[in-house]
Amino acid sequence: MPEISVCIPTYEFKGKGVKYLADIFDGLRKQTFQDFDIVISDHSEDDVIHDFCEEISKEFSIIYLKNPNDRGFQGSNINCVMENAEGRILKLLMQDDLFVDDKALEKIKKGFDETNCKWLFHGFTHTTDGIETHRDCVPNWCDMVLEGRNLLGSPSCVAILNKTKMYLDTNLKLLVDTEFYHRMRIEYGMPHIIPDILIANREHENRTSSVMSYDSRIEHPEGSWLVDSKEIDYLMVKHKDFFINDKRYPDEN
C-alpha cells in the first residue's frame, strides 16, 4: 500500500485533458517523496485519457477507472476516486491544477506525521499558462463556510487520511466543496494548515466555478458572493441543527 494516493478526477476538458494531466505528471516526477500511486476516475466519453494513462503507467503506478456515472458532476467523480484509493493519505488534485513545489508530497506527509491531524489544507497560487504564477493564498477558516464563503481553497488544496475520508454531497454543485469542509470539521475538528504554496489553480473559462448558475448574492461585511438559492435552502434543512446551535462547531464548545 502506498503512503499517498494522488487522487485526480478527470474528463475530456474540451481536448485539453491530456495536456493538463501531463503537467501534473511532470510535477510528480520531480517530487522528493516518491512513495505514492495515482488514482484516476475518468468521466470522459472517449478513450484519450485512458490511452494516456496506459502509456504512462510504464513509469507510474496508476489505478485508472472509467466512471460513466453522473458525468459532469464533479462531486461524484471525486467520490469515485477517493473510494478506490488505497494510500494512507489521500491528496486530492483537480485535473487542471498542478504542483508548484517539488517537496509538496513530502510536506503533506510531514504535516500528518507531526500534528496527528485527520485532514489538512495547504497554500495555493494561480496560473493562466501553467508557468507564471500570481496571487498566492494561505487557507483560512472564516465564518459562513457552509454558506459558501470560501477562503480555504478548492479541493486541490486538501489532503485527508484515508481512514477518515468523507464523501461529497452529490446533491450540490456550487457549494459541494464548502459543505464537505463543513462536515469534515464537524467530525474531525479544525484542519491543519500548511502555509507553503504547494499547488497552482489554473484560471480559465472552462473552470467549474466559471460555468455555474447563480441566482442570489450573500452579503458580508468583508465582501459578498454569489450562490444558488436552492442549494442554500437545501443546506438549511440538511444542517438545521448547526444553524439552531448558533453556527457553532463541536471544537468551539
Where is each model-derived feature located?
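Acidic donor-binding loop at a coil-to-helix junction in glycosyltransferase catalytic cores
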Residues: L174-F180
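Active-site nucleotide-sugar/metal-binding loop of Leloir-type enzymes
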Residues: N79-I89
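A conserved acidic beta->alpha catalytic loop
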Residues: D42-F52, R71, M94
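Short, acidic, metal-binding catalytic loop of nucleotide-sugar glycosyltransferases
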Residues: D23-D35
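Short beta-strand/loop segment that forms part of the nucleotide-sugar
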Residues: D35-E45, L65-N67
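Short beta-strand-to-loop acidic/aromatic patch adjacent to the donor-nucleotide binding site
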Residues: G87-L98
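Flexible acidic/His/Gly-enriched loops in nucleotide-sugar-dependent glycosyltransferase catalytic domains
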Residues: P68-N79, A104-M166, E205, S210-D233, ...
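Catalytic beta-strand/loop signature of glycosyltransferases that borders the donor
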Residues: G123, T178, H192-L198, E203
